[in-house]
C-alpha cells in the first residue's frame, strides 16, 4: 500500500507541474509586425492617435492587433506593469495615510462626527501636503510602536 501511494504521489507531482509559459511563444508578436495593428495604425486620423500607435508599436500584440500587457516578472517589461503598480500603491498609501491622520486629528474634537461628514478643508489640506512622506512616517510609527494597537485594546467577539 505504501509503494502504491508513493508511486501515485510521484506520478501526481511529476505530471502536475506545468512548464513555464512565456509570452514570446504564446502567439504574441511585436505590434510593429502585426498586420492588424498596422491596419489600425494606418486608419488613425488625428496626430495624437498616430503618436499613440507609434508608442504602442514597441509592445507585443495578439492576433487581434491590440497591445497586450505582459505581467510575468521579466524586467524588460517593468515599464508596462511594475512601475505603474508601484505608483498606484504609493498614491493609495498616501490617500490612506492622510485620511488616517485626519481622523486621528479630529478624534478629540467635540464635533468629531460632524467633521467626518463635513470635512475641515484647511486641516485636510495640511495633512495632504505632508502625506507624500507616508512611507517614512509609517516606518517611524511602526518602529516606535504607535502604529499597531496593543493587545488589550482589541476587543474579542463573544462567539
UniProtKB/Swiss-Prot annotation:
One of its GO terms (biological process) is photosynthesis. Keywords: Photosynthesis, Photosystem I, Signal. Residues 1-23 form the signal peptide. It comes from the Bacteria. InterPro entries: PSI_PsaF, PSI_PsaF_sf. GO terms for cellular component: photosystem I reaction center. The keyword ATP-binding does not apply. Belongs to the PsaF family. Probably participates in efficiency of electron transfer from plastocyanin to P700 (or cytochrome c553 in algae and cyanobacteria). This plastocyanin-docking protein contributes to the specific association of plastocyanin to PSI. This is Photosystem I reaction center subunit III. The gene is psaF.
Amino acid at each position: 500500500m505504501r509503494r502504491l501511494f508513493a508511486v501515485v504521489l510521484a506520478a501526481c507531482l511529476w505530471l502536475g507541474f506545468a512548464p513555464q509559459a512565456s509570452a514570446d511563444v504564446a502567439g504574441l508578436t511585436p505590434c510593429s509586425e502585426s498586420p492588424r495593428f498596422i491596419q489600425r495604425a494606418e486608419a488613425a486620423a488625428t496626430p495624437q492617435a498616430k503618436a499613440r500607435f507609434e508608442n504602442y508599436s514597441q509592445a507585443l500584440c495578439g492576433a487581434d492587433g491590440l497591445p497586450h500587457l505582459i505581467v510575468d516578472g521579466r524586467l524588460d517589461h517593468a515599464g508596462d506593469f511594475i512601475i505603474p503598480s508601484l505608483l498606484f500603491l504609493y498614491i493609495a498609501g498616501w490617500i490612506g495615510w492622510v485620511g488616517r491622520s485626519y481622523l486621528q486629528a479630529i478624534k478629540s474634537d467635540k464635533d468629531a462626527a460632524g467633521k467626518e461628514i463635513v470635512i475641515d478643508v484647511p486641516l485636510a489640506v495640511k495633512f495632504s501636503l505632508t502625506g507624500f512622506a507616508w512611507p517614512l512616517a509609517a516606518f517611524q510609527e511602526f518602529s516606535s510602536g504607535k502604529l499597531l494597537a496593543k493587545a488589550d485594546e482589541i476587543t474579542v467577539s463573544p462567539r
